[in-house]
Amino acid sequence: MDGYDRRAPYDLNSRKINHPDFESVMSQRDTFNNVSSKQCMENQWIVIHPTRQTRMFKEILAGRLGYTDGQGIYNSVRSTETAIRQIQNTILTLSLDAVRYDDLKNDWIRHADMRGMSAKKLARTYGMHSEAEAVKVAENVFVTWRKTLQTTLINLARQLISCFTTANINTSSFSKYIDWICCLGIVPVVRHDRSARATSSIPTCAGRSTVFPNWAFHDASSRLRVVDSVMARGKQIVNYLSNSMSAVSILEYDRTLIEYNFFKRELRVKDILSGERGECIVIWRPVMNDGGVIFDSPMQRIYKEIIECHDLRQHATLCRLVNTAPVKVLIAKRDDGCKGVAGAQRVIDKVLGDQPENAASSAASRLVKLIIGLKGMRHVGDITDTVRDYLEETSGHLLDAASIDTSQPGFGQSNRAQSSTTEETRRNTIKIRDAFHSSVVTSINEMLEGYVNKLFNTVEGLKAANKDLLAKLCSKELELDRVRTEHLISKQAHTDMGNSQYSPTLETLARDLKHDVIDVGEVMDDDSYVANSFQSRYIPAYDVDLKRLSELWEQEMLRCFKLTRATNNQGHEVSISYSNSAITLLLAPYFFSVLNIYDIGPIVTNHEVYKSEEELCNSVFEKTRIHVYLDDLALIFNADVKRAIAKYFLVRNNSGRQREAEDLPDGHHGRRNDFHSPSSRRERYSRRSGYKRHRWNRESRRDYRRTQSTTNGEDDDGSQRD
C-alpha cells in the first residue's frame, strides 16, 4: 500500500450536506465531463474522474460490453465473505480474551462443589481401588464442564455477532471498496465525527428477544462469573465496530469527482450531489501522462484489449447484418410470338379490338401501328416506306379522289377542257394519290429534319454543359476522397487509442450503409429466366480473441489480487478463494486505512475464511487465553486428585499402624529387635510410612500447593489442615 497522500486542508464546515436541484446537478456533471485537461493543468488541478475512460471501467465490470468466463473471477474478489469472517473473528477473539483467571477458577470450584466432585470426594469414592480410575473420572468431569462452558460462551458471542449483522451498515461496503481498487486503485471516503454519528445497535438488539434472548444471558450470568466479563467486552467491541463503520462512507462511483495535483502530489474528492468533501486512500498511485493520468489498476491494464475485442464483435455483427441482406434479380423469359414489333402489334390488336378484322379497320389501330412502325425504324429511309404503307392502308379513308375538282388551279391545264371518262378518272385518282403521298412524306421529312436539327443543337449545348459539370464532378470527387481519407485516418486513430466513444454505433452504421447497385441488364437476353442471387456470407471469427480476453481477465485477477485456484484431480476448477497474501493485500488496508479500526485481533487465515460459523467459533476458542486457563485448571485438578488419593492412603496406613502397636505384648514397647512384622513387605512399608509422616509434620506449617488463596486453613481438597 502506498500510504496516505498529502491532502488539501479539510474544512469541517464543508461537510454540511446540501441538496441542489436535479437540473443543476446534471449540468454540473456535464460541465465536469467536458472539462479539458489542459485547462485544468493551468490551475495545477486535473479531473481524473469522471472521464469517458473511468466511466467505461465501471460499465465493463457491470457487463455492458459483454461477459466472458474469466470475468467471473471478479465476483470472487468482491465477495464480502472475507470481511464478514474477519468481523466474526474479531468479536469472538476479543470477547473471549476478556475472561479473568480468578473468575474462571471460582466458577470451576463452584461447579465441582455443587456436583460433589471435589478432589477429596473423588479420592474417597474412586481412589480406594485404583488411582488411575479416579484420575480418569476427574478428567471426564472437567472435560464435561469445559465443553458446556465453551458452548455457552460461543452461543452468547454468536448472539453479539447476529446483533452486529442486523445493524445493516452499508455505507462502508467492502464491495464498493473492491470496485474502486479494481477501477482506479484509489478509494474516496467521507469521514464523520463518531460522537455525532454514534449509534449503538446493542440496546435495540437487546430489546428483541428473538435476536438477543435476555433470558439466556441472565441464566448464564447467574451461574458463571465469566459471562459478565465476556458480554461486557463483547458489547464494547460491537459498539466500537458499528460506530467506526458508521463514521465512514465510501462514495458512490457515479457521483464522485476526483481531482489530482501532480506538483503537490495531492488528491481531493467531492460528492457531486451532496457537495461533501472527503479524502482519498491511495492503494496504487496513478502516473501522470500527457495532461492526464494512467491508473495502476487491473481495469487500466486490460481496458484496451476489452475495447478491441468489443469492436471486433461489433464488426462481426455488422458483417452479419450486411451480408445476409439478399440482392434479388428477377428475370422472365418471353414467348417468341411476343418479341419485337409483332408482339407489340398483337398487344395493340387485343386492346383496340376483340377481333383482328375489327382492329384492322379501326382508325386508332392504324394510327398506333404507324407510331409503332416509326418507333421500330432503324434507318432514315424507312420513314418513306412506313408512311406509304400507312397511306396505302388508309387511302380510302383519308383521301376521296372523286370529290376533288381537278379543274382548279394546281392540277394542270390539260384537265380543264377534257371530258372525264372512266379510264381518265382512274388515272387522275392514281396521280392525286401519288401526289398526296409525296406531299405527306415530304412534309414529314421536313418536320423530322427540323426536329433533328433542333435536337442536334440541343445535344451540342448539353455536351458543353456536361463537360463543365464533369470537370466540377471530378473536383468534387477528389475533395470527397480527401475528406474520406482524413475521416478514416481520424477514426482509426481514435480506435487505436482504444476510445470507442467516438466510433458510431451499430445502428448508425446500419442506417448509413450504402449497397452497390448491380446492373445486369446488358448481359441479359430474351432467353434468360427467373433466378435469385445472394451475396456470399462472410463474418469475421472472434472466438480466438474472445478466448484470449477471457484468459487475460483470469490471469490479471488471479495475479493482481493473489487469489488461489482450487482444482480437483481432473484439473477442473472447483473454486476461487482468497490466499493469505490476498487477505493481507486487501483486508488489512480496508480495516486499518479506510475504517480506521486497528484493534481487530489477529487477521484471519485463508483456511478460516471458508470454514463454517461453528468451525470458526471452535477454532477461535482454541486460540484464546481461556483455552490456556482451562488447560491449567485441568492440570491442577488432576494433581489435586492424585494428591488427595496419596493422602488418603497415608491416613489409612497410619491408622493401621496404631492398631498394630496396641496389640503388642507388654515389655516390648515396639522395639525393633524385639518385634518382627509378619513379613518383610510389611516391615518395608512401615518404614516408608514413618519417613513420610516425619516429613509431613516438619513441613505442615508451609502453605503447600494452596489452590485458593482465600481459604481459611483448608487444603486443596477441602479438608482442614493440621
Curated annotation (Swiss-Prot):
> For the region Putative leucine zipper motif, what residue ranges are annotated?
448-469
Q: Which UniProt keywords apply?
A: Disulfide bond, Host nucleus, Viral genome packaging, Viral release from host cell, Virion
Q: Where are the transmembrane segments?
A: none
Q: Which GO terms describe its cellular component?
A: host cell nucleus; virion component
Name its GO BP terms in alphabetical order.
chromosome organization
The compartments listed are: Virion; Host nucleus
**Residue spans with biased composition (Polar residues)?**
404-422
Q: Where is the composition biased (Basic and acidic residues)?
A: 658-683, 697-706
Query: Compositional bias of type Acidic residues: which residue ranges?
Result: 713-722
User: Pfam families in the record, alphabetically?
Assistant: Herpes_UL6
UniProt-annotated stretches for the region Disordered:
402-426, 658-722
Which residues fall in a compositionally biased region of kind Basic residues?
Answer: 684-696
Q: Which family does it belong to?
A: Belongs to the herpesviridae portal protein family.
Q: How is this protein organized at the quaternary level?
A: Homododecamerizes. Interacts with terminase subunits TRM1 and TRM3.
Q: What does this protein do?
A: Forms a portal in the viral capsid through which viral DNA is translocated during DNA packaging. Assembles as a dodecamer at a single fivefold axe of the T=16 icosahedric capsid. Binds to the molecular motor that translocates the viral DNA, termed terminase.
Q: What is this protein called?
A: Portal protein
Gene assigned in the entry: MDV018
